[in-house]
Design a protein with these regions (language model features):
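Conserved phosphate- and dinucleotide-binding cores of soluble alpha/beta proteins
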Residues: 194-198, 206, 216
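Catalytic-core "active-site belt" of small-molecule-metabolizing enzymes
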Residues: 2-201, 243, 253-259
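Short, charged beta-turn/beta-strand-edge "cap" motif at the junction between a beta-strand
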Residues: 115, 232-236, 250-253
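Buried hydrophobic packing segments
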Residues: 45-46, 165, 207-214
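A short beta-strand-loop-beta hairpin characteristic of the jelly-roll/cupin
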Residues: 120, 212-217
Length: 259
């Protein structure tokens, strides 16, 4: 696929975000696109953001549940980039600033050392992690009606939107991440729940997968990076006036309000 086509698709996605008007399914219009093309498209928009003063502060891992992988016909996760502008600081965001937001409860890793592939292990991840904490990711799609396949979501920065971290910082060696339980509430009503093992069996394994996959692109996970390790339960559509709380055993709570 030509770089010209990559640029056209990247521009269409960027305009969709800017104007809050989603585009049609990319993989329908360009059926010959491969996953490597999709990552190149993703990077075009990320590089532009960085050039404009919006730095990369971490990564997110998507498609970590077997059910979602089966739905999209893939057998591996994907990844996207977290930018400084994506972090929610005050616990509230404007619903109108997003297209089709959905909420997920996740375990976040914050690194104290770099992690390099291609042979990173769970042990390497735990040793390189400063702390783990509760997180809510707001996924969003620039593709109309969330009508996505693997190519579409990868090109669209793994359907990234925004995220918020909890305040409790836990040494990963002090908690069994696989057994951490999460309950997601909307307006104080329990919506769904999940455990750490829901993401490929172990959130730390997901981060190791990411480090090893990034090695193929010449990228290393860096000290200070925030890594969102994958949704512990199904994503939930969000609307103005709703407040979400993800409550984790060991890791505490994190709350987000849509205005």
């Amino acid at each position: 696929m030509s770089s010209e086509i990559h640029s056209i698709i990247a521009s269409n996605l960027k305009n969709a975000e800017k104007n809050c008007v989603p585009v049609g399914k990319i993989s329908n219009e360009y059926p010959q696109l491969a996953i490597k093309d999709a990552y190149k498209i993703q990077l075009i928009n990320i590089d532009k953001e960085v050039e404009e003063g919006n730095p990369i502060i971490g990564k997110k891992i998507g498609l970590t549940s077997e059910a979602v992988q089966n739905m999209l016909g893939v057998n591996q996760p994907d990844f996207g980039h977290l930018l400084k502008s994506m972090e929610v600081k005050n616990g509230a965001i404007k619903r109108i600033s997003l297209l089709q937001p959905k909420v997920e409860g996740e375990i976040a890793f914050v690194l104290k050392n770099d992690i390099s592939g291609p042979n990173a292990t769970v042990e390497d991840v735990l040793e390189a992690t400063d702390y783990v904490t509760a997180a809510i990711e707001i996924v969003d799609s620039r593709i109309e009606n969330w009508n996505i396949g693997i190519i579409d979501t990868v090109a669209d920065n793994a359907s990234s939107g925004m995220y918020i971290l909890g305040e409790k910082k836990i040494d990963p060696s002090k908690v069994d991440l696989k057994s951490v339980e999460m309950r997601l509430y909307m307006n104080n009503q329990l919506i769904n729940s999940g455990k750490g093992e829901a993401v490929l069996g172990d959130p730390a394994y997901c981060v190791a997968w990411l480090a090893n996959t990034l090695h193929e692109y010449g990228v290393t996970l860096k000290k200070g990076d925030v890594i969102l390790s994958g949704a512990l339960s199904a994503m939930v559509a969000a609307e103005a006036g709703q407040e979400f709380r993800a409550s984790f055993t060991e890791l505490g709570d994190v709350t987000l309000r849509f205005e």
